Amino acid sequence: MLWVPYILLIFIGLFCNNSKIYDFCVIVFMGLVAWLNTGAADYSVVYLPTYLNPFGVYDMDLGWSWLCALGARVGLYYNGFACILTVVSMILYREFGRKIGTNTSFMLALFLVFPGLMSLVQFRQFVASAVGCVGLAHLWTSKMKSRYVVFGTLMVLAILIHRSAVVLLFALLPSFLAASGKRGRVVVLLALMAIGCILFVNWRTLSVQLFGEMRASVYLGVSGGSNGVSVLGGLRNAILLLLMAVLPYLCNRYMARIKGTLGKELFEWEVGRAPLGILFINVVLLVLVPVVFLTNDFMRFERHGLTMALGLFAMMPSLKKRAPILSCKALYVTVCLVFAYFYVANTFDSVYVPLLNPQSIPPFFI
C-alpha cells in the first residue's frame, strides 16, 4: 500500500533543493509508516513489551525507558508514541542538514533509500542518532556561549537512549587534533589502537552490552540471531567501512581544492567543521575492521557514520563548481542502494514488506 509513495518520494527528492514541502512530506510519510507498523521485526518482541513495561526490561537504556513511560502517561498507544517520536526525530535530522548547509531534500531522499526503513526497525538507535546529530550541528554552527551546554545535554540524552551513540563524539576529533599538536595526535592514534584491540578481544561481550540480546545480526543476514559472520560477510563489512572513510575524504578534498586550501594540512582545509567531523567519525570507524570479520553487530556503529555522511553527500551536487563524479547524485544513491542490498536483502520480508504493506490500522491512543 505504501510502496508507491515510498518510491515516488525517493524519485522526487532527487530533483528538489531544500524544498520545505518535500521535506514535510517525507517527515509525515515516515511518521505514517511508524504508526502503521505492526509486523516488522522487533515490534512485538522488543518494542511493544518494553513500552508496556518500560522499567522492567533488563539492561534497557534509561533514556528510552523514560520516553516510554512518558508516552504511556500521556495516553499514547505504542504506535502513536512511535509515530510522534519518528516525526520529532525526522525534524531533528532535517535540522541537522539545515544547520550544516546541505540540501535537506536530497539528504532525506538518500535517507529513504537507506537507512530510513531500517531505522524504524532498530528504532532506538535512529532516535539517538537524530538527537546526537542535531547536537553536533548546533555545536559546529552556533556562536553562542551556551552551545556547549546544548551540545552536552543532547549528547547525554542520545547516549541514554542508545549507548552506541557514544561513537558520535569522534566527530569532535578534528577540533581536538588541530589544537593538540603532534603529541596529542600520537596519543589519539594509540587510544584508537587500544580501542580496536579491546573490541577484538571482548567482541562477544561488548556486542551484547552495546546492542542488547536482540542483536543486529538478526537483520544482517545471520540466521537464528547468531552473531557469527562468514569470511565473505566480513570482507563485505570491511569494504563498506573503507568506502565510507574514503568517499567523505574525497568530498572534503574536492571542497578544499575549490577553497584553494588543499596544499595546507587537513585541519586547515577550510571546508567547515561539519564536513571534517563527518569525515573523522567515518575514518575512526576503521578500527572496527578486525571485529567485523567476527560479527555483524558492530556495523551498527557505521549506521551513525552513514547517517551523518548523507548530509555531506547531499552538499556535493550543489557546489558552485561541480565535480564530474563527486557531484553526481547517482553516485550517492548507488552507495545507499549498496548498503540496502547487503543489509536488508536477506531480511526483506521482515523489514520492507511489513513496513510498506501494513495489514491494519492500530490505535493511536490507549
Language-model features: locations:
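Short acidic/glycine- and proline-prone juxtamembrane loop motifs at membrane-interface regions
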Residues: 120-127
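Membrane-interface alpha helices of multi-pass inner-membrane proteins
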Residues: 115-116, 149-174, 286
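Membrane-interface transmembrane helices that cradle and orient dolichyl/undecaprenyl
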Residues: 132-148
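Transmembrane-helix signature of polytopic, membrane-embedded enzymes
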Residues: 21-22, 94-113
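Alpha-helical transmembrane segments and terminal signal-anchor/GPI-anchor hydrophobic tails
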Residues: 38-65, 173-305, 349-366
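Signature aromatic-anchored transmembrane alpha helix within multi-pass, membrane-resident enzymes
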Residues: 191, 321-342
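Loop-to-helix entry region of an early transmembrane alpha helix in multi-pass inner-membrane enzymes
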Residues: 74-88
